[in-house]
């Protein structure tokens, strides 16, 4: 039963972040700014590292509504969310993963889209 | 043709989902300046694909930086050209997201509550929060009314009408939060609710009926065919007579006749010919008459008149018997003298 509640909580959290991200996207000025964007073709254990990369880049977006931007960053840092994307394997948790700078540069629109896809991927794995 | 048709139907219904297949990529070296890789050979794409390529077997896939557009969709990618490229293996990858279609929902059931409230329940093909469902219903075969999609597996009809017939159908897809599937599933098997009877009538008409119709017609056709074959086989001799008429050959019948020489042989052997083997000749009494000269005129006239009646009877009996014997010539000779 605990596992079920845990699952429901996590999925609700993920849903919340995805919705907030969409709100944020509406208020961002997509003026062609380029950001390092992690790809989705990454190893399972590098999920968390990719999320961290995204989380450090979000504040760089030019958003008119700062409140929602801060909320998104806060949620991406949350323990609950991190537990969703964490790796099961003990070995090489953050070892073999790419550094944030090594990911290709994409414009802000692509960046937000990729982050949403990453969160959706996590949600599909969960439910 | 019906056999093929029914097999095709089975194959199609067994398919879980239909996914438009990823198009083929064709790459062309343009004037030793660059490489154009396109995927619009089989028609303009209706979705945006992501293109990747790599020049070396070992190495990472690189995403396309210069997409070629047509009607607001990406149809190809322009790659930079290297002199050795024509002698290398170029590996390409075309990726499309959310090309997905679910099975339709199953186990539909309707029940009327105390309120009164008409509730529809169903099961989605997968038990996950990622699926949203859409309900449509019609009252007494009027226009379909569609609900807003929701993640519940239950739907309540607002203020149901009395003495009406409701027909329900449900379909599902992956919701937007989880990465929306491009296609809705097919509509589920319909279910009917008749407020008069207060019953759950699962409408079996539709695809299941058409399956039955196909099967029955197939069985019927095969049965008829087998029966026809059997009839033809039984009556094959008679049919042969009708279709290929026999040419009469009198030679066969008269073969034994023509072989024999004597008349006696004819009489005894041939039965079909019109000779009477039991012919007995009736003996006719013959009398000789002489003219005695007493007085010239009277005696002549008397002798002329005296024709024996017996002889005329004889003659008649002989000629009446069915024969073509040359016996009559003897009688004639006797009469004159």
What annotation goes with each model-predicted range?
Chain A
Residues 3-127:
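Extracellular/luminal segments of secreted precursors and ectodomains of membrane proteins
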């Amino acid at each position: 039963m605990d596992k079920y509640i845990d699952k429901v909580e996590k999925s609700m959290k993920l849903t919340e972040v995805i919705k907030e991200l969409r709100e944020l996207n509406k208020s961002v000025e997509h003026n062609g700014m380029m950001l390092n964007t992690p790809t989705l073709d990454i190893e399972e254990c590098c999920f968390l590292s990719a999320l961290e990369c995204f989380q450090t880049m979000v504040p760089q977006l030019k958003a008119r509504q700062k409140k929602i931007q801060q909320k998104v960053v806060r949620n991406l840092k949350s323990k609950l969310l991190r537990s969703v994307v964490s790796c099961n394997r003990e070995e090489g948790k953050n070892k073999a993963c790419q550094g944030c700078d090594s990911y290709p540069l994409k414009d802000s629109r692509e960046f937000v889209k990729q982050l949403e896809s990453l969160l959706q991927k996590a949600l599909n794995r969960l439910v | 043709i019906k056999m093929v048709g029914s097999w095709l139907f089975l194959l199609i219904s067994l398919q879980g989902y239909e996914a438009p297949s990823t198009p083929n990529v064709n790459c062309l070296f343009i004037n030793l300046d660059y490489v154009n890789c396109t995927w619009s050979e089989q028609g303009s794409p209706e979705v945006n694909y992501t293109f990747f390529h790599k020049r070396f077997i070992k190495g990472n896939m690189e995403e396309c930086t210069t997409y070629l557009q047509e009607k607001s969709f990406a149809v190809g990618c322009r790659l930079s050209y290297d002199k050795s490229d024509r002698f290398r293996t170029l590996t390409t990858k075309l990726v499309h997201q959310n090309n997905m279609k679910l099975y339709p929902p199953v186990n539909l059931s309707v029940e009327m509550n105390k309120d009164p409230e008409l509730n529809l329940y169903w099961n989605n093909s997968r038990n996950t929060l990622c699926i949203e469902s859409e309900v449509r219903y019609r009252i007494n075969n009027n226009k379909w009314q569609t609900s807003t999609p929701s993640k519940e597996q239950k739907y309540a009809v607002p203020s149901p009408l009395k003495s009406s017939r409701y027909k329900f159908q449900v379909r599902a897809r992956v919701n937007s939060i989880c990465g929306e599937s491009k296609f809705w599933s097919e509509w589920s098997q319909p279910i009917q609710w008749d407020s008069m009877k207060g019953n759950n009538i699962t409408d079996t008409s539709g695809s299941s009926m058409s399956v039955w119709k196909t099967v029955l017609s197939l069985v019927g056709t095969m049965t008829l065919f087998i029966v026809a074959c059997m009839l033809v086989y039984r009556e094959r001799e008679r049919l042969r007579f009708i279709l290929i008429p026999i040419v009469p050959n009198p030679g066969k019948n008269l073969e034994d006749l023509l072989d024999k020489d004597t008349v006696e042989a004819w009489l005894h052997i041939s039965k079909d010919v019109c000779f009477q083997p039991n012919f007995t000749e009736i003996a006719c009494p013959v009398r000789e008459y002489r003219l005695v000269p007493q007085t010239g005129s009277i005696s002549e006239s008397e002798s002329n008149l005296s024709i024996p009646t017996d002889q005329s009877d004889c003659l008649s009996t002989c000629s009446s018997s069915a024969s073509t014997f040359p016996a009559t010539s003897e009688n004639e000779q006797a009469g004159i003298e």
